[in-house]
Amino acid sequence: MTEYESAQKGALKLKGCGDMSLGKKKKKKNKANDQIMQEIITSKKNEEEKKKPSLDKRTPAQLAFEKMQEKRQMERILKKASKTHKQRVEDFNRHLDTLTEHYDIPKVSWTK
């Protein structure tokens, strides 16, 4: 029996766990991190306020290109907004009617 007397009796214990049988470990709040984050946020706001408006370094061709792009985009938006969904579906069905039977697909219903 002397060989078995040195054996541990009872529940096994994990290393580094200590007496934490009640549940999860509580997280510590780091006040220094909170202060640092607040300082970073305020410094970014101050930098944005201090920034001078930068000069426009685009060439006349680039300006004209962007102006035409905006104009075309507005035309596309107005064109799409001018038709209702029902009108678009009817136009699509008319287009399908003109195609040959090779491309035959059922008509689209505007009610669904």
From Swiss-Prot:
**Where in or outside the cell?**
Nucleus
Q: What InterPro entries does the entry give?
A: FAM32A
Report whether Repeat shows up as a keyword of the record: no
An example of a Pfam family matching this protein is FAM32A
Q: Which residues cross the membrane?
A: none
GO CC annotation, single: nucleus
- GO biological-process terms attached to the record: apoptotic process
Which parts of this chain are annotated as the region Disordered?
15-35
Please provide the record's keywords in A-Z order. Answer: Apoptosis, Cell cycle, Nucleus
SS bond list: none
Chief location bin: nucleus
Q: What family is this protein classified in?
A: Belongs to the FAM32 family.
The protein's role, per its UniProt record: May induce G2 arrest and apoptosis. May also increase cell sensitivity to apoptotic stimuli.
Protein name, please?
Protein FAM32A
Organism field: Xenopus tropicalis (Western clawed frog)
What is this organism's lineage? Eukaryota, Metazoa, Chordata, Craniata, Vertebrata
